[in-house]
């Protein structure tokens, strides 16, 4: 458990230091993928084709670490979000999101959505139904940290509908 906390704190510290890059003067809405990736601290990876069925819009997946603790850079185009989903575990498990660039959203089932900005960290316990993704007018990148556990699995659920997403301010 101490290793997980240490890794999470190290990732947050590194991300905060690296994300202090200047913003695009044109505004993020007009920013291209190439422009956005120049200001992100992590390589966005490749199109997230393996999980495309669970996303509205284009996302990209870049592995940062696949040993000990899985850490992946997930990059979302403006308006892109994943479906509602749950990270199940018999013991431990869950997910940690560390926001690195752009603006995004996180929402737990039955609660108000929370705006995400670089340096923000979200701890998601196992068993919590939630979604996350980019703001409508901004590219967004976060690190997804897979919290180790026993009997872990993901359950992908219904999409976040356009009418629900459009109400976010």
Regions found by a protein language model. Name each.
Residues 69, 77-80, 103, 150:
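Short, charged/polar surface micro-motifs in flexible loops or helix N-caps
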Residues 105, 117, 126-154:
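Ligand-binding loop in jelly-roll beta-barrel domains
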């Amino acid at each position: 458990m101490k290793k997980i906390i240490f890794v999470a704190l190290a990732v947050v510290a590194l991300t905060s230091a690296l994300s202090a890059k200047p913003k695009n003067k044109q505004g993020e809405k007009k920013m291209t993928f190439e422009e956005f990736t120049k200001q992100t601290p992590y390589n966005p990876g490749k199109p997230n084709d393996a999980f495309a069925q669970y996303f509205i819009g284009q996302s990209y997946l870049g592995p940062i670490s696949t040993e000990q603790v899985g850490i992946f850079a997930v990059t979302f185009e403006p308006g892109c979000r994943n479906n509602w989903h749950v990270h199940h575990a018999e013991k431990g498990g869950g997910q940690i999101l560390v926001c690195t660039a752009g603006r995004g959203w996180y929402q737990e089932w039955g609660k108000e959505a929370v705006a995400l900005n670089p340096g923000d960290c979200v701890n998601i316990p196992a068993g919590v139904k939630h979604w996350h993704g980019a703001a409508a007018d901004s590219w967004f990148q976060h690190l997804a940290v897979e919290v180790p556990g026993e009997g872990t699995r993901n359950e992908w659920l219904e999409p976040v509908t356009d009418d629900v997403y459009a109400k976010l301010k």
